[in-house]
Amino acid sequence: MAHGQHGGKSGPLGAGRRRGRGRWYAVAPALAATVVAACVPAAYAAAPPAPAAAAAPAQGAGDGLDRYHRQRLAWGSCVKGPDDTAGRDLDRAGVSCADVTVPLDYADPRGRTITVAVSRLKATDTRRRIGAVLLNNGGPGGTAVESPPHIRKAMKQVGTRYDIVGFDPRFVGRSTPLDCGWPVGTAWFSAGSGRAGFDRQVALQKDLADKCRAAGASVLAHISTRNTARDMDVIRGALGERKISYLGYSYGTYLGTVYTQMFPGRYDRVVLDGAVAPGDYKARLMQGAEPENERALSDWAAWAAGRHDAHGLGRTRAEVLATVEGIVAASARGPLTVGAAPEVFRLDDTQVPLILFMGIADDTDKARTALAEQVSALAKAAQGRPAPLSPDFAQLLRYALTGEQAATGGVQAAIICGDVGAPRDPEVYWRDIERSRAAHPLFGPLTNNINPCAFWDRPREELTRVRRDAAVLIVAATGDPRTTYRSSAGLHELLPSSKLITVENANRHGLYGEYGNGCVDGEVNAYLATGKLPKEDRTCSTASPSSSSSSSSSSD
């Protein structure tokens, strides 16, 4: 995720992507989302438009939820206060906002309630209105209230036929808040180069869990993906929609899959971008993704080598990687000092790998340049030289290493730890870290490290498993270092009626409306327009983003 003016810092491992994008471990400079025009593939057939829904259906009646499904939403200004520039931007874009009341505990619908913030950019082509599409930007813990204007642009002509609805999941963003009071913005650090770093991490992660327990004792048990899916269904009912369409990125693909399993028959068109197979969803989210991250780093190193005159990191891939290794080794000997008074940061070997990890989820030139600038600053610090920070790098470090945006990290941990249990014994993590070092010395100690879930109460519900087919559209890049292509393909196999759009040779997390690939955008928009999945799985090239896709045999 990258920093941005609209979404704030909502990402899990870095500043939040523009428009509230909060994608799972995706940190990169904000993109000026240029959507390339593409022709609608001929493999689609038109479907009849759906009229605007009238009253909410009676789904939920008999289980105490009827009053939530039938609530009247008070749509109005999105501005929450005098400093709410994002709210003013939404108002200017024609977006309206409201709060949806949901039960804290769905087992006790007459008990305590909380609110979930929603935003809506209404369809302007009312004669051909299709319905409403609900957005989730991942994270977990990412916001989406600020996303409808951007998604409307990505959807092109079909966007005018939808009510585009963003929401901030329970305890996220503009919804009923939870702030654990963390001293850092994320829990996802490396174990470092030795036992001392790991022991510091054990103490930190226990402290983070304890802080959340102290701040949110009455709500933590009710923060989970399954409860967010239940909130989504209340939103659907409150909007008056019999079925709702859905666009989810990263973790949002897991949330979307959970919704299809919990509420079959209540969804229409579902797009899952950068998908997570339910079996891959675990407390250590990135465990097993070390090869993809190392390939992404290696590809970035080759790119940086071609720009040695600009960044001075090495003239070959091997030289750039040696520079990176030297930085990590120096940080293990003692923290690296970057920045200048009054803003100075000291980064050790539990933090430097995080910076590298955050920078490789986007292979655009802009993102790669930003990472090169960050590595250049770290290289200077490793040599004991002054290492001034760019505004973007300073913002990223403030997010990760201070409490400036601590609420984001705390809620993300609450969602993950509320979903899935984790080993309690720190030695389990240490053994995994040590086993990973030989093959993956840089990222193994990060992806296998302990986190707050080791000290969390056990989840109230079991993880959701796929037991029903769902005709969804999955979008994935072969080199995605966050939600790996293996996971997207795995979800595709679990859902025989799904179709998979593959972007080859891209180290990119998050494609639709973000990557400028006209093939991807065209396929997704055709599906949203017609409700018809492509007849076959499709492959899109990165060589000419605005060109048509090439077809491949279905892997169903």
Label the model's feature ranges:
Residues 241-251:
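Alpha/beta-hydrolase fold nucleophile elbow
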Residues 63-65, 322-470, 513-515:
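Alpha/beta-hydrolase fold active-site neighborhood
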Residues 211-218, 229-243:
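Conserved acidic catalytic loop of the alpha/beta-hydrolase fold
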Residues 473-479:
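Conserved strand-to-loop "acid loop" that flanks and positions the catalytic carboxylate
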Residues 2-7, 14-30, 37, 41-195, ...:
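Catalytic-loop region of hydrolases
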Residues 507-518:
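Catalytic histidine-centered segment of alpha/beta-hydrolase-like enzymes
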Residues 481-486:
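Conserved alpha/beta-hydrolase "acid-adjacent" motif
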Residues 179-192, 258-323, 356-358, 373-389:
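A catalytic-pocket lid/entrance helix-loop region that shapes and gates access to the active site
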